[in-house]
Amino acid sequence: MALTLLPALTSCHESPQYSNDAYGNFDALWDIVDQRYCFFSDKGIDWDSVGRQYRARIKPETNILELFDICAGMLDELHDGHVNLTSSFNTSYYRKWWSDYAQDFNLRTVQQYYLDFDYGSTSGITYKMLLPDSIGYMYYPSFSYNIGETNLDYILAILHKAKGMVIDIRDNGGGALTNISTLVSRFIDKKVTGGYILHKTGPGQDDFSKPY
């Protein structure tokens, strides 16, 4: 989710009830998140309470820089690394989703000590046979890298003698479900229910489609 905060947000916002000041900009942002964010119930977030808490920090003289920090702090309460607030001078980002945890992965260590700097790479996937005809290794650093069926054909042809497979997704920040499905489908030979998708269908916090 990307939200843009500008000094005159209401000039391009179709809701006339928002005043063109710090309060109006804050209220517009709060409403957008209230109507479109999906995980309030899952996370147990009282968005009304969060809104009151941060709105109370606004004063008539609050400038755009101060307002940005207030709004960014409110969005941080979602604890969601996919939610950003973007302006012409800054972009907020919830860093604690990774900064609060120890860094336990070093790509250089893998490349040097496990792969001996000798490996293949395609579609963002690093791959190699570890141990003679024994363990296949694939490192997929981001689900945003598009995987081609032909690329997978080559990788799996090279690793076809492997008795086991390591699919390393450490430090992967996420991406597209389609890429995950393309990869995982190569290791499943029957129909499997791996999850469900729900779509937001209305402005209410619990307005979702049926799972499919």
Task: List the model feature ranges, each with a label.
Residues 1-11:
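Sec-dependent bacterial lipoprotein signal peptides
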Residues 11-212:
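Flexible, low-complexity junctional segments that flank or bridge functional domains
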